[in-house]
Amino acid sequence: MSQYSDDDYSHEDDSEMEDEDEEDEYEPRSSRKGRSGKKRGRSNSDSDGRRGSKKKSSGSAFIDWEVEVDDDVEDDDDDVDVEDGKQQLKFGDFSLCFIVSGEADLPNEDSDHRRQYYQRGFHPHEEDVDELEKRTLERLSTKYAKDDYELDDVNDVDQQALLPSVRDPKLWLVKCAIGREREVAVCLMQKIVDRGSEFKIRSAIALDHLQNYVYIEADMEAHVKEAIKGMRNIYANQKILLVPIKEMTAVLSVESKAIDLSRDSWVRMKLGIYKGDLAQVVDVDNVRKRVTVKLIPRIDLQALANKLEGTENVKKKAFAPPPRFMNIDEARELHIRVEHRRDPMTGDYFENIGGMLFKDGFLYKKVSTKSIAAQNVTPTFDELERFKRPNENGEIDFVDESTLFANRKKGHFMKGDAVIVIKGDLKNLKGWIEKVDEENVLIRSEMKDLPNPIAVNGRELCKYFEPGNFVKVVSGIHEGGTGMIVKVDQHMLIILSDTTKEHICVFADHVAKSAEVTKGVTKIGDYELHDLVILSDFSFGVILKLDSEAIQILKGVPDSSEVSIVKASEIKYKIWKKINVQDRYKNVVAVKDVVRVIEGPSKGKQGPVVQIYKGVLFIHDRHNLEHTGFICTRCSSCVLAGGNFKTPALVPPSPRRFQRADMGYNPGAGGRHQGGRGRRGDDHLVGTYVKIRLGPFKGYSGRLVEVKDKLVRVELEAKIVTVERKAISDMTDNVVATPQYNMGSQTPMHPSRTPLHPCMTPMRHSGATPIHDGMRTPMRGRAWNPYMPMSPPRDNWEDGNPGSWGTSPYEAATPGSDWGSSTPGRSSYRDAGTPINNANAPSPMTPSSTSYLPTTPGGQAMTPGTDLDVMSLDIGGDAETRFIPGILVNVHKAGEDRNPGVIRDVLPDGSCVVALGHRGEGETIRATQNKVSLVCPKKNERVKILGGKYCGSTAKVIGEDGQDGIVKLDESLDIKILKLTILAKLVHE
C-alpha cells in the first residue's frame, strides 16, 4: 500500500548515506562548538534503522525526513554554507540562496518560534515553494534593511581599495611576434598547467587591439624572464617594460558596444585625404566588418591622368584636392580610361576609373568599420545640400530624413512639443507629446479615430512648426539665434533672424519655441561683433556675424559688397585705433558721426559711421537689409550730416605732407630733399607712408613716426621698427628728388643768397600795373591758356621755348620781365619748394580757381578729389597720361558730383567724348581733359596701362600695395608693380 516504489526507497537510502558522510566530515567542527553528540547519535541510529527495514510506511518515511530537517536547521554551523558572500539555507531536498554582505550573519531565530514553525508539518504538496521563498526573503530584508543601506555606502569606498597598489603584482609588457599574441598567452597558460608552481607568474593577457605585445602579471621581472624562456614567438633580447600603476586599470578596458550601422546613415571618415568628410552608408557587411560609403571625391584628374600614363611626379603633394563631383566627360578629355561596369553584388552600374567606382558624380568606396566615425555625426545643412537628389516627382528631397535625427541627445523632446511622424506606417501623423520614455514617446494625435496616446519610437519623430512661430536655434552653427519662421519646407525652416535680419535655413529638429529675443553670439575669443580686424592676407574688414565655426567679415573694398567667411585663426589682430578723416567738403568725420553717401553704388544711403580705416568708412544703414545694414565706401564719397557744403579750394595744402611755414625765411628747418638736418624729430617725412628699400625689412611699408639723425622709426602694420634713413622711400609722391629738365647740374641746388627772400612792398609783383599784362588784347597766347589743350604740353622749364614767360629762377631777371624787379634768386612766390615744384605761368585773371595759380607750399598736392593738371608729373609716373577710348573715368561738372562715364572718342584738340554711366548707357557729352579723371581700379579688374614702359598693354589687377598696383600682364603673364595713377579701368561692353 505504499505510495513509493522500490526505486524511490533506494534513492532515499543513497541520500541518507551521503548525509551521514557529510555529518562525519563536519563532526570536529561540531565538537568545537560544544554541541552535544546525543542528538547526533539519535539521528545516526534512526538512519541505521531505516537501512535495516527497507519496507516502511509512507508516513514513517515522512516523519523521519521531517526530523532530519529539524536537526539540520537547528545546527546552524553545519547547514549554513557561507561562501563568497552567499548564505544558503537547506530545507530537505531544496535550498534558498541569499546574497548578503560578508559582515552580516544570518539572524538567530528564537528557538520557540523555530520549533513552532516546523511542528506544523511540511509536505511538498501542502505549501508552495515560491511562497515559502517569498516569506523568507521578506523576513530577512525587513530586519536588515537599515544595515544593507549603510553597507551600500561602504561598498563605494571599498571599490577604491580594489585599485592596484605597490603591494600588488606588477604588470609587464613583453614584445612578441605580430599576430602571435594569443598563441603566446595560451602557451604560457599551458606551461603553468604542466609544470605547476615552478613558474611564479600570475596571468598573461593578449589584447585584440594591441599587436606585437602581451601583458604578463608577476611580482618581479626575473619571474617573467623565467616564464618566457625558450618560447620562439617572444623576442627575448627585447627589453621588458613595466606598466605604471596608474595605467594598469586602463589595460583591461571593456570594449565598447558595436556600432549599429544601417543603410543611409551618416558617418564621417577618419583616415586619409577624406578625413572629416561626410559620407553616407550604402551597404553594410557585418561579417567582414566593412561598409560601402558614398562620398564626394577628392581627385585631381590631371594627376590621375599622369599616373595612368606613367608620368606621375614623384614629389609628394602637400595638400589634398578639394571635394568635387566627378565629371566623366572631363576625364575622357584627359584620355583617362572609363569603363561602364555592373556590380555583381548590387546589380547597379558604375563608372570604373582605375579601380574606383563612380555614380552620379559620387565615389563609392569600401572601407573598414574602424575607419569611420558613426557616433554623434550631425551633418550641417550645407553638407546635406550636396547629397540631395530628385525624387520620383522631380522635387529635390533628402535620401532618408530619419537618418538625420539618429544622433539626438537625451531629453531632446519635451512634453507639449508638436511633432510629426516621418517614418513607418504612421508617417505624416501630427500630434503632441504627452510623455517621454527611454526610446518610445507617447503622443496624442489629431485624429479622433486613433487611440490616444500612441507609442512611437523617438527616431521616427521630428518637431513640427508653422510659419509665424517664434523659435530659438538650440543646436548647429546658428545656435543661440532667435527669429520668426517665414517658410516651412518639409522638415527645414527658413527663419528671419532677429539680429542679422537675414534668412537662415535650419532643420526643424534644431529649434525650439521661444518668445525671447537674443542677440545671438556677440563674442568669440578676443573678437566681438562689428570689430575692425586685419586678416592673414593683410586685408581689413568689419565683423558682421559670429558663429561657432566661422566669422563673416565685410571687407574694406569701397563700393563693393565683398563678404568673406573665415575662421578665427585667419584673423591676425584687431584694430583699436580711432581715426578721423575728411569728407567730400573737408568736414572732419569721426566714429558715430552720421554721413550720407553722394556717389557710387550706395548713393543716397546714410547712417552712423561704425569704423574708419585707410580712408574707408563702414556705415550702418538700418534701412539696408543686406549684410546686416553695413555698407563700405570712401570718405570722399560721403558728406557729413549738418556739415559745411561749400566747395573747398582745388589745391589745399596737405597738413600731413607739408609743414606749415612762415612767409619769411626759417633757418632752422631743412627743406625737402635738400639735405638739411633740421630739428630733432621735425621732418617733412613724419606722418607719410614710406617703403623700406634695404635691410632685413626690405619691402615692408608703413608710416614714419620719428626722425633721429640718420635713423627713422617706421610704424609697420604689425610693429614699429628702426632702420636707416637711406633705406626708405616715400610712397606718397611719385616723383624723385633728382632735379629734372635744366636743373640737374646745379650744385648746390639753391645757391647762397642774402637775403634769400628780400623785403618787398607789395610783396608780389611790385610795381606791376596792370598786373601780368591783364589789359593785353588778346589777353595771352594760346600756348599759355590753361584751358586750351596743348600737344605736347609745355611749361616754363623749357629754356628753348620762345613762348616762355619767365627765365630760370636762379638767374638775374632782365629788364622787361613780367615778374617785376627782384633780387636775383628764387622768387618769393612760394616758400621752400623743391625745384620740381615751380608752378606754371600764373594766370592774370583775378580771382581764379585754377591750379595754375601759385600755391603755398608749391606743387600740386596729391589730395584726393583735386583736379590734376594734364602736365603734372604725378600722372603716369615718368610719362604723361593719354586718355584712350574704352576706359572708365569720372567727369567733373561745376556744382555736381563726379559722374562716371566711358570715353568713346578722343578728339584732335585733346577733348574727350564721354558717355555717362558705368557702362556708357547715359547721355554723351564733350569734356576737356582737365575735367576728366581716371577711376582707380580694384582687385580682379581689367585695366589698360596709360604710361611707362608697358603703355598700351592690358593687364589684370591682382592686388594693391599702397599707391602701387600689382598687375598681371595679358601678353607675357608677368607680374608687375605699377603706379595706380597710370592704370585705367577697362569697361566690358
Curated annotation (Swiss-Prot):
Q: Which InterPro entries match?
A: KOW, KOW_Spt5_1, KOW_Spt5_2, KOW_Spt5_3, KOW_Spt5_4, KOW_Spt5_6, NGN-domain, NGN-like_dom
GO BP annotations of the record are: regulation of DNA-templated transcription elongation; regulation of transcription by RNA polymerase II; transcription elongation-coupled chromatin remodeling; translation
Q: Which SMART domains match?
A: KOW, NGN
PROSITE patterns in alphabetical order: RIBOSOMAL_L24 (PS01108)
Q: Could you tell me where the Acidic residues compositional bias lies?
A: 1-26, 65-82
Q: Which UniProt keywords apply?
A: Activator, Nucleus, Repeat, Repressor, Transcription, Transcription regulation
Family named by the database record: Belongs to the SPT5 family.
Kindly provide the name given to this protein in its UniProt entry.
Answer: Putative transcription elongation factor SPT5 homolog 2
| Annotated source species | Arabidopsis thaliana
Q: What is the lineage of its organism?
A: Eukaryota, Viridiplantae, Streptophyta, Embryophyta, Tracheophyta
